Amino acid sequence: MKKLTFALSLGLMTCFAYAEKAPIRLSEGPSNAGRSYSKIYITSNVDSVVIKKILVNRGNCKDAEYRPWKPIRLNFGNTYTRLFTGKSPGVPCNVIEVAVDTNQGVWTFDFNP
């Protein structure tokens, strides 16, 4: 039984050691566009990554940019910013969760207040 427990523990530790690291770093902050807007900053941690889609608060915040969304390629160290607001006019977007769909998978980031 001890051997089985040890083998299982070793296997789990190996899985954690090889867990993938997100190809992007994400942060959020206030916008100079007004209190109703939140700004998302996405920075590449890898040589090249394509951002396909950004989903804020499981779709409860909407994209507030005037230009339509299109996928964007980021090289290592480059940062892309995007504005989001609440779904109703004048309602702010309090960013709690952001899911970013990339060419290297979907990555979810949590912001605990």
Segments predicted by a language model, with ranges:
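A short, compositionally biased
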Residues: 35-36, 91-96
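Hydrophobic h-region of N-terminal signal peptides that target proteins for export
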Residues: 10-17
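Positively charged n-region of N-terminal signal peptides that target proteins for export
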Residues: 1-4
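Intrinsically disordered, low-complexity Pro/Gly/Ser/Thr-rich segments with frequent PxxP/GP/PP motifs
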Residues: 62-93
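Edge beta-strands of extracellular beta-sandwich domains
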Residues: 97, 104-113
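A short, sequence-level motif marking secondary-structure junctions
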Residues: 55-58, 87-88, 111-113
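Short, surface-exposed binding/anchoring microloops in extracellular/periplasmic proteins
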Residues: 22-60
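Elongated, acidic membrane-bridging lipid-handling scaffolds
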Residues: 77, 98-100
